[in-house]
Amino acid sequence: MIPTMNRDPRALRPQAFGSRRVKDVSDPVIEPAWDGVRVLAHLDVAAARAAIRDSSGDDLTRDHAPIAHALLAALAADSAIVDGYLTDQATRASEGRAIVTSEIPSLSEHTSQFFLGQHGSELLGGRGRPGRTDLGRAADEKERLEDAPIAFVAVDLVELDGEPLFEIPLLERKRLLESALGEGDLVRRTPYVREPAGTFIITWRSFGFGGLAYKAANSRYLPGSANDDWCMTPMPRR
């Protein structure tokens, strides 16, 4: 059983989305909107301690001990607080099915690995679609993934090595997150794009996402408060 952190992380809550319209978000970073439980992961590698807290401050660490261990193993820093979601959406079969039937030629190997993992991505051809002889294997993979595990999908970096990042612009926090947190079966980083995002939005819609998150590239992090530089919108139908 992984020990939880000594300091009380309950005072820190995730930043909430505001009510601003999408068109009013300046220079947006666009992400798929994740279904799942919003959490902050408090990680201390030196002490081998982690705490995963939801937006109410409840401790979910023991319920998700494998994810806590995976987060500590993935962190290339002494400590961090990472904003993310506990979700099966990154690993479940509905997204996998969308990948193997996608007609979007630009689907990358990284995107395939994000949703299916290394084994699942081996089913796909170089352009993100299986060859004709792979369709049976893809169906077997879909069935295998019906009971997909919950993973942690990181969306933001709140603190790094004891230094709060509240005043650092979002895009820079994203870059720090990419450097600080590796990926694996139970730890992912959300994909994000800048405008124009039409092709990526089509891809995310085909994966089964129901909405999009728009976040100003220069936005700061307001823990526990709503920030109008962040907004959610339903997935466009076309």
List the model feature ranges, each with a label.
Residues M1-R238:
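Catalytic cores of nucleic-acid ligases and guanylyltransferases
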